[in-house]
Amino acid sequence: MSRVAQLDSIALDKELYGQFWSEFNAAFNTSEHKEEWELALNTVVFMCATRFLPHYGSSCTYGSALSGVVFQCRKRTLYVVTVLAGYVWKKITHIIFNGPHCGNQMMWLKLYKWVNLLYHGCDVTNFLRFLAAEGPNARAFLSPLYRAFNVHSTRLIRDGSAIASEFYSNSVFAGLEYQNRQLLWNALLELFSNTLLTKRGLLTFVKKPPRSRSTTTYKTVCPRCGGFPTNPYQIACCRANYCYVCVVKALEWSMCDACGSSGRLTASPVY
């Protein structure tokens, strides 16, 4: 079965729990006994999902039902690995890091770090085995905790045949369609930026109105930067003096800042 669907089921559950918790936390003061409040809320969400969703002989969460994935285990086992285990780990972490830093506490802290490192190593190994699992009889475990409790995920079966969640399929196709539109839009923007929106292509259609300064002013003031012309060049259309850098820009854009002329401009050094 699709490995992406199994991973998406976990991501959907985390997003659901996080959304409910953020709304609950904004409405009520949960500064005291925060972990217990979160456990109670996640338990209610889990019970509602497992009670009212169709199971077809298996256990499933809200996210797994949307992605067409079920778990071959009992509901209480699925509750332990999806909800209760996270609460227990948070409480252990809270006790170890917030306890008094005595001799026993430092020993527990070292043990915690070693257990955490060992779990992450097992998690990497389990993920590689999860990706390599093939065949209809292969068991896929989403984490070492799932493997320890023998909670493996399979495809949702109805009437003897595997079915795909319509919501999940539509979500995947909608995501692909959105990415295709983004690629097309980026290609159009790149086309415009390389053709119509270039300085030469755009400024040929835009003519600046003539400046009100007199010709004598442009002999001592660069019409582009407003400073004294450094290494001056005189443009042929109105004989205004430009700085060298400014006249290069004016010739590149084919637009005179002094008189608004456009087209094939030329300039020559004053001295």
Swiss-Prot record:
Pathway annotation from the record: Protein modification; protein ubiquitination
Membrane protein topology class: Multi-pass membrane protein
Catalyses which reaction(s): [E2 ubiquitin-conjugating enzyme]-S-ubiquitinyl-L-cysteine + [acceptor protein]-L-cysteine = [E2 ubiquitin-conjugating enzyme]-L-cysteine + [acceptor protein]-S-ubiquitinyl-L-cysteine
InterPro entries listed in its UniProt record: PEX2/10 (IPR025654), Pex_N (IPR006845)
EC number(s) on file: 2.3.2.36
Keywords tagged on the record: Membrane, Metal-binding, Peroxisome, Protein transport, Transferase, Transmembrane, Transmembrane helix, Transport, Ubl conjugation pathway, Zinc, Zinc-finger
GO cellular component: peroxisomal importomer complex; peroxisomal membrane; transmembrane transporter complex; ubiquitin ligase complex
Pfam families: Pex2_Pex12
GO biological process, one term: protein import into peroxisome matrix, substrate release
Residue numbers binding Zn(2+) 2: 237-238, 256, 259
Stretches in topological domain Peroxisomal matrix: 1-2, 61-77, 134-175
UniProt entry tagged with the keyword Metal-binding: yes
Protein family according to the UniProt entry: Belongs to the pex2/pex10/pex12 family.
Subunit structure: Component of the PEX2-PEX10-PEX12 retrotranslocation channel, composed of PEX2, PEX10 and PEX12.
More details: Present with 339 molecules/cell in log phase SD medium.
Domain-level remarks: The three subunits of the retrotranslocation channel (PEX2, PEX10 and PEX12) coassemble in the membrane into a channel with an open 10 Angstrom pore. The RING-type zinc-fingers that catalyze PEX5 receptor ubiquitination are positioned above the pore on the cytosolic side of the complex.
The name this protein goes by in its record: Peroxisomal biogenesis factor 2
Species this chain originates from: Saccharomyces cerevisiae (strain ATCC 204508 / S288c) (Baker's yeast)
Record gene name: PEX2
